[in-house]
């Protein structure tokens, strides 16, 4: 309910959030300071969840077009060896931050490489 505050005050505090979830199949090997089977090339069916927010909508009435998020993530990562397309050690944490950096309205990314392993990057 709107009380004694004017509509302008209410809209100033509102935030739009969109969430895009997609699956990406990709391979990688990790460069680690300790021995691990993850140093060998292996793959995941990653579940990537991208969170975007904005106080205002763009000219098309969106925070960001869902297809833009999909394009950025899928074209760069899907069915690739991540060591060949990314310039950093492709840990789930690093991938989450990289995705967040690619999308201007993004503030949080979850990278799930298995049922029990999820990395989250979130900006303040």
Predicted feature locations:
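Charge-rich, low-complexity N-terminal segments
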Residues: 13-124
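Single conserved hydrophobic/aromatic residue that forms the stacking wall/gate
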Residues: 1-14
């Amino acid at each position: 309910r709107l009380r004694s505050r004017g509509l302008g005050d209410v809209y100033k505090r509102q935030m739009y959030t969109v969430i895009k979830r997609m699956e990406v199949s990709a391979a990688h090997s990790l460069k680690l300071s300790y021995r691990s089977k993850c140093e060998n090339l292996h793959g995941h069916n990653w579940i990537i969840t991208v969170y975007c927010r904005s106080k205002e909508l763009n000219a098309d009435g969106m925070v960001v077009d869902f297809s833009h998020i999909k394009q950025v993530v899928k074209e760069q990562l899907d069915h690739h060896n991540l060591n060949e397309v990314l310039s950093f050690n492709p840990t789930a944490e690093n991938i989450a931050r990289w995705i967040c950096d690619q999308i201007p309205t993004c503030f949080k990314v979850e990278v799930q490489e298995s049922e029990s392993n999820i990395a989250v990057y979130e900006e303040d």
